Regions:
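Phosphate-binding P-loop
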Residues: 1-4
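Hydrophobic anchor at the beta1->P-loop junction of P-loop NTPases
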Residues: 7-9
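Walker A (P-loop) phosphate-binding loop of P-loop NTPases
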Residues: 14
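Walker A/P-loop
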Residues: 18
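Post-Walker A helix-loop "phosphate-sensing" segment adjacent to the P-loop in P-loop NTPases
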Residues: 25-34, 48-53
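ATP-dependent small-molecule kinase phosphotransfer cores
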Residues: 38-129, 156, 160, 168, ...
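Short, well-ordered beta-strand core segments
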Residues: 130, 146-150
Length: 185
């Protein structure tokens, strides 16, 4: 029997949930799962299949496609991190774009999609020694997690964190675009 537990890190967007979770997972040698990345991967799938754009969202088509969508996390030895994979392809670099950021909240509000994602998160969390971060992780997904954290920060600090992350990933974007996006989320 394993002594490893589920650790849930919850909070508002761009507060450092993933940074804390990754560091803690490395230190404890736990599996790290970024639930926000899962929703971003689902959003990327919807964009690639033209189910969603700024002007339309065909949630029914996306729901019908659920059996064809496989999201998981695989360890990348080169960068010493777990990366989100969509249908066996790493999409880590693609899911952080502003386009995905601007559409992910629409995906997350569809009840049937949320139910499916929670089911996948429960499956991933059933493995011993998991640290999962994201909104609602400690309240909805794993309300009985052995350890739970909640992170929050000012709007400006959250925008600064996200802006720095995007600039480091070579996205061409202004701070005010990021700030506006964070306000919406």
């Amino acid at each position: 029997m394993s002594n490893k537990i589920i650790i849930a890190i919850d909070g508002t967007s761009s507060t450092g949930k993933s940074t804390l979770a990754k560091r803690l997972a490395k230190k404890l040698k736990y599996l790290y799962i970024d639930s926000g990345a899962m929703y971003r991967a689902l959003t990327l799938y919807a964009i690639q299949n033209k189910y969603i754009s700024k002007s339309h969202f065909d949630s029914q088509k996306l729901i019908e496609d659920i059996p064809n969508i496989h999201i998981d996390f695989q360890y990348n030895q080169q960068n010493n991190n777990y990366e989100v994979h969509l249908n066996n392809n790493s999409v880590e670099k693609h899911i952080r774009s502003l386009k995905v950021s601007n559409l992910v909240s629409q995906i997350a509000t569809v009840g049937e999609l949320r139910k499916h994602m929670v089911k996948v998160q429960h499956f991933l969390g059933s493995k011993n020694g998991v640290i999962m971060d994201g909104r609602d992780i400690g309240t909805v997904v794993f309300p009985n997690a052995e350890i739970k954290f909640y992170l929050d920060a000012s709007l400006e600090l959250r925008a600064k964190r996200r802006y720095k992350e995007l600039i480091e990933a070579n996205y061409k974007i202004s701070f005010y675009e990021v700030l506006s996006n964070i306000k919406l989320r």
